Amino acid sequence: MLKKSFFALNRSWLKYERLASFPQRVRRIPVPGQVTYLFNTPFEKTTDLKLTVGAEVTRGQPIVLKEGRGGRRASTVTGVVAAIASHDGNFGRRYTAVTVTTTHPETQEAADGGFAAHAAAPDLDTARTYLTSAPGNPPLDCLADDRRPIDTIVISAMEEDILIGTRQYILKNDFTAVARGIDVLRQISGEMRIVLVVPRDSVQGFGHIGAEVMAADVDYPSGHSLLIMNNLLGKPVPTGASPEDCGVCFFSIEAVATLGRAYTDGTVPVRKTITFIDKAGAQSLATVRVGTPVAAVLSAFGIVLNDRDRLIFGGPMTGQAVHDANHPILADTDAVLVQDRDSIPYSSDYPCINCGECIRICPVHIPIDMLVRLLEVGQYQESADQYALESCIECGLCGYVCVAKIPIFQYIRLGKYELAKERAVEAADD
């Protein structure tokens, strides 16, 4: 839905999607023949592996790749480890991919993995062992990080992009699980302030949920974590810092519902709710095992990928393209978007025409027209020093309104990545 006011020069006219526009039926994607889990550690640097090819795993059982942070996650299927390999991500990120071949279809819904014995008494260590990388990707390690003490937990029911309805669906249909999840958070985190952020048009009816309720505007990108910090919590995040540096940890509402279901049912939740957007722009909701190849989702919806079609994880403003239909659905994948090759918006190398649309739309008031000039010629440090590159929240609005079709959003992401590389090299030299 688009609305534009002549006077609201710094206000986006893009709105978050309303759940009423989605079909009521939620499609259940079958258990695939193989799943893949991405561990946030480079395969080449992973020594003393605790996992071997051929090892058997059960649903809900923690898979231990290595000791330490990021080295374990619960399996979403019962099966056998088929491969352990390197996986390349965006902007130089390196992962370790563990592929599991599913076995015993009759036990896929019943296996326990050992969590039931701990469900009666929630504690942070057990939650980190079993529920880190569960649906919604609960950032439980953040609560255990003594280097950055947390005093506030924000539960966001705001979508990360337009056209998505995943979190709204959880808010509306998993209310009991969310309430139980808030109770679990209080038990495992201590006496922290817990804030639930919901769309302004959905703020009624949450007075008894056990958290402080705040309403965010339905104008995109009001639900961005940095804007919530500034506009609702009154805690502006300094340039180069994160909400965690300011004592605030963000949970998606699905992550909290996952905690609630886990400690209510005594099993580790394994199904992720996603919004699927097909080539015609039609939206659907589905549940899928974390680790399922996106090809299985496409098959369930009858979508055939042609040469030069685009497959995106996330929404149209900030989503990231994936190059392989076997890429797994991740714990924080809220949407899958398919764009037909004939419908993909084009980008150009035309120069800026100084129309000012990007400056008017920017929610953090960055002089985008000057910033992009430096980014185009690789002047990354200068763009940070002179035009606040690191203050950009990467909402994508500037690229959306650009008359010259300059890929501003991509320039900004690349600029931040290259700047971080330059600083890492300088630090190593020192």
Region locations from a protein language model:
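Active-site gating/interface segments in enzymes
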Residues: 221-223, 227-236, 264-266, 302-353
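Short, well-structured beta-strand-loop connectors
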Residues: 52-65, 80-83
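Ferredoxin-type iron-sulfur electron-transfer modules in oxidoreductases and energy-metabolism complexes
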Residues: 335-349, 359, 363-430
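Short, conserved beta-turn/loop elements at beta-strand boundaries and strand-helix junctions
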Residues: 83-89, 304
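Acidic low-complexity segments
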Residues: 88-152
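N-terminal, Lys/Arg-enriched amphipathic/low-complexity engagement segments
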Residues: 1-50
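Hydrophobic alpha-helical positions that pack around
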Residues: 134, 143-145, 188-292, 300-305, ...
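Short hydrophobic beta/alpha edge segments that flank linear recognition/processing sites
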Residues: 58-71, 96-102
